[in-house]
Each structure stands twice: as C-alpha cells, then as structure tokens.
Amino acid sequence: MDQGTIDGVDVAGNTIAAVCHVPGNILEGNWTAAIFVNDTASDAQEKALLKVYTGQAGGPIAELAKLIGKVVSVERAPITFDIVGAKGTLKIGTDYYAELEPYVGPSGAQTTLSDTVFSTVPGAPVFVGKAPVYRSKNAAIGIDVNLKNHNALQSTFRFEA
C-alpha cells in the first residue's frame, strides 16, 4: 500500500499477497489460497488488511475474494518486490520467488495486448513477457513448481476509495 487507512488504521507501507491454486477457469472460482502479510505489519494493520482482502469490507476487492473457496493459511513473511523499468522480482518468504520481464518490439516498446480476453484485469492492457524464474512451494495448496523461461502476463490496476 502506498498510502491509506482502513477503519482508522494507517496501512501505508504494508503488503499483502495471496498464493493460489486455480483448479480450472480462473473466473469460476474455487481457488485454494495461502495469504501472506508482510512481517513488519502490526497486529492492527494485519487485521485491517485481512478485513479488506477477505471481502469483509465489501467493494471491488470483495468480488475478487469471492473466487477463493478455501484459505489454507494466513502467515507473516518478508515480502519484497522490486521494479526497474518493466522488469520485476517478487519474493514472499523462502518458498515463493518470481522474476518477470516484458517482451519488447523492434522500437523497444513493451509488447502489449489490448481489448483481449487474455487480460486478467478487464479493460486494462496486458504486457506479454516471460518469467526467467518462477518458484512456488506450498504443500497445503498442492503447489511445488520450479519453472524457467515460462510465459508471463503483466497488467496494472489501482483501487481507490
């Protein structure tokens, strides 16, 4: 969160992440999820973030939360993400790590899909790229993958209230 409060609790500087198993069509739901809150959040900040991201506070995030059928854990972990240009890395604890980088065209611009059903964020462009590294391991979710140079789709979104 760059800035913001939830029920009077300042949540700026905090991160929440979900690692999910999606058993089929992403929009049909029944996802299994492990939820992570950054390890520097206070108990009050964690409670406030979970209220929003589990859908209890309503709004657009509640619609997203409806897709999760089962939460197997809520954990504290270091969560880091670094973005340099259009390349980025994400690390959650010791069991999740991803690198993403875009494909670029001859002009150096990112390869973009617009007005496509392949967007995970309706109405937003999709940036096509690859994940040089993607590792994810969680026995409760049934995930244990270590992929190299796999496809990756990136998009942007912003929630404001």
Model-found features: residue ranges?
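Low-complexity, acidic/polar, glycine-enriched regions of mature
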Residues: 6-20, 35
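Residue-level signal for the start and early helices of compact helical domains
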Residues: 7, 26-28, 72, 148-150
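Charge-rich, amphipathic alpha-helical segments
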Residues: 22-25, 30-32
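Extended, charged low-complexity segments
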Residues: 99, 103-161
